[in-house]
């Protein structure tokens, strides 16, 4: 397993983009601090972990109602602070936040968008003003251990039935 240490001020996306394209498990350990950037993880078997959700935060600020240079709205599915589009990935001991507010002006603002089988979210905090977590299609093996989903309750997820 490959272990990579990242500190505040370093670009997490640059580290992810430089990962080997093999199938070896990788853990990216984030030192305590704030990582202000939009992240896309498309490499399988990759874990992003912090020391605790209280001290390690990944944050960005895209809202669905934002007008892009082409004159169109951003839309919900392009607002995620962290996109995980790979299988067997994990997120541990991290806060992922979409800081776009207020809801009435920005619309939906995903913190975490997961499209991959076997995703594990452990001891994390997810924050946004609306639609904090989005999984699509519903993965058959979604794992949420001791994770906070958002400011309101939600219905249980049933793969292939929603």
Language-model segments: which ranges?
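Residue-level recognition of the N-termini of beta-strands and the immediately preceding loop/turn
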Residues: 2, 24-28, 108
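Right-handed parallel beta-helix/beta-spiral solenoid domain characteristic of secreted/periplasmic
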Residues: 5-9, 45-107
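Active-site-proximal loop/turn and secondary-structure-junction residues that shape catalytic pockets
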Residues: 34, 64, 139
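N-terminal extracellular ligand-recognition/capping segment immediately after the signal peptide
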Residues: 7-17, 23-47, 52-58
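Acidic/proline-rich low-complexity IDRs
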Residues: 1-2, 11
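Generic, low-specificity signal for short hydrophobic/alpha-helical stretches with a mild N-terminal bias
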Residues: 12, 21, 30, 73, ...
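Right-handed parallel beta-helix
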Residues: 82-162
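Generic, ordered loop/turn and secondary-structure boundary motif
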Residues: 35-36, 59, 113, 134
């Amino acid at each position: 397993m490959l272990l990579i240490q990242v500190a505040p001020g370093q670009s997490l996306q640059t580290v992810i983009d430089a990962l080997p394209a093999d199938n070896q498990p990788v853990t990216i350990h984030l030192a305590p601090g704030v990582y202000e950037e939009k992240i896309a993880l498309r490499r399988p078997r990759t874990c992003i972990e912090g020391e605790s959700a209280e001290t390690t935060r990944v944050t960005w600020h895209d809202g669905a109602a934002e007008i892009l240079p082409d004159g169109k709205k951003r839309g919900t599915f392009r607002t995620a602070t962290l996109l995980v589009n790979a299988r067997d990935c994990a997120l541990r001991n991290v806060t992922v936040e979409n800081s776009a507010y207020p809801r009435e002006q920005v619309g939906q603002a995903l913190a975490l968008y997961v499209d991959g089988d076997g995703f594990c979210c452990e001891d994390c905090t997810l924050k946004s003003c609306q639609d904090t977590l989005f999984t699509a299609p519903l993965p058959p093996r979604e794992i949420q251990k001791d994770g906070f989903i958002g400011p309101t309750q939600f219905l249980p997820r049933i793969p292939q039935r929603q």
